[in-house]
């Protein structure tokens, strides 16, 4: 009994030592406001009160999660876009801390599944990834993909938001397209049926949802979420039932932006 208690105490102390230290909360000043206003369309549509709340959430994220440039000089814009990508999917919740994330690595370009990049690396076609195994707790993003996701607001494609939605999906322990922490149990079966119906439409070329969403339930949820946050009006018009389900899931309606209570 005492031996087990001793091991538990040692384990907890190791956790405290290894747990990333929270950085001091930075002030949401004019520089950050300007970066978000010029580069994040979602932010521009917010009311003044919501913009301030969004900014505070961005600063909180940057105090909790380390953003590291890998062989590149990380710019404030990169930090702002990473933090905005993290904040957008959970802005409908009063508070949210990503349980499975301690660092975001920003690569200069696309990479492969072995996290290799540069001219000598083969199969460099990955733009973003949630790490697992020895990379658990990490997210990897290509800087080009990160920035392009916010430059083009009409293509229904945002790599960073896509990866943060995967993290939300992982909150229940697995990335499977069924975000149980966001969804009441009663909606599970209707959600799965809707996913399969929509995937069938994608794979039959009868949908404007990106083809990658038809590859698995996991990717469908992330791809549909990109569309939901980038083009909410079009998403609601073309996929009204799915739109309603996503509003319930994310507790917000991007068309109107204000938190849906």
Predicted regions and their residues:
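Active-site recognition of the HExxH zinc-binding catalytic motif
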Residues: 47, 155-171, 222
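Metalloprotease/metallohydrolase-associated module, dominated by Zn2+-dependent proteases
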Residues: 81-97, 109-151, 174-261
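A metal-dependent hydrolase signature that marks the N-terminal structural subdomain at the beginning
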Residues: 17-128, 242-245, 249-252, 259
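Generic beta-strand structural signal
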Residues: 102-103, 137-139, 157
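N-terminal signal-anchor transmembrane alpha helix of single-pass membrane proteins
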Residues: 1-25
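Conserved aromatic-histidine-acidic binding/catalytic patches
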Residues: 42, 46, 70, 74, ...
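Hydrophobic (often cysteine-bearing) scaffold residues that line and stabilize catalytic clefts
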Residues: 50, 54, 153-157, 218
């Amino acid at each position: 009994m005492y031996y087990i208690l001793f091991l538990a105490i040692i384990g907890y102390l190791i956790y405290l030592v290894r747990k990333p230290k929270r950085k001091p909360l930075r002030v949401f000043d004019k520089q950050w406001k300007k970066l978000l206003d010029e580069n994040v369309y979602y932010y521009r549509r917010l009311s003044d009160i919501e913009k301030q709340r969004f900014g505070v959430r961005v600063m909180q994220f940057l105090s909790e999660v380390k953003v590291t440039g890998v062989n590149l000089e990380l710019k404030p814009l990169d930090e702002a876009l990473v933090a905005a990508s993290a904040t957008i999917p959970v802005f409908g919740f009063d508070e949210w801390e990503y349980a499975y994330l301690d660092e975001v690595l920003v690569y200069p370009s696309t990479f492969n599944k072995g996290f290799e990049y540069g001219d000598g690396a083969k199969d460099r076609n990955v733009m973003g990834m949630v790490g697992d195994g020895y990379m658990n707790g990490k997210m990897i993003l290509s800087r080009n993909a990160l920035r392009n996701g916010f430059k083009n607001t009409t293509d229904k494609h945002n790599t960073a938001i896509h990866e943060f939605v995967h993290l939300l999906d992982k909150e229940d322990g697995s990335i499977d397209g069924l975000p149980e922490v966001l969804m009441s149990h009663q909606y599970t079966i209707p959600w799965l049926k809707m996913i399969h119906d929509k995937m069938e439409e994608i794979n039959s070329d009868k949908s404007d949802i990106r083809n990658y969403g038809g590859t698995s339930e996991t990717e469908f949820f992330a791809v549909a979420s990109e569309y939901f946050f980038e083009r909410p009006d079009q998403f609601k018009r073309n996929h009204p039932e799915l739109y309603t389900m996503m509003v319930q899931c994310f507790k917000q309606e991007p068309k109107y932006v204000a938190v849906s209570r």
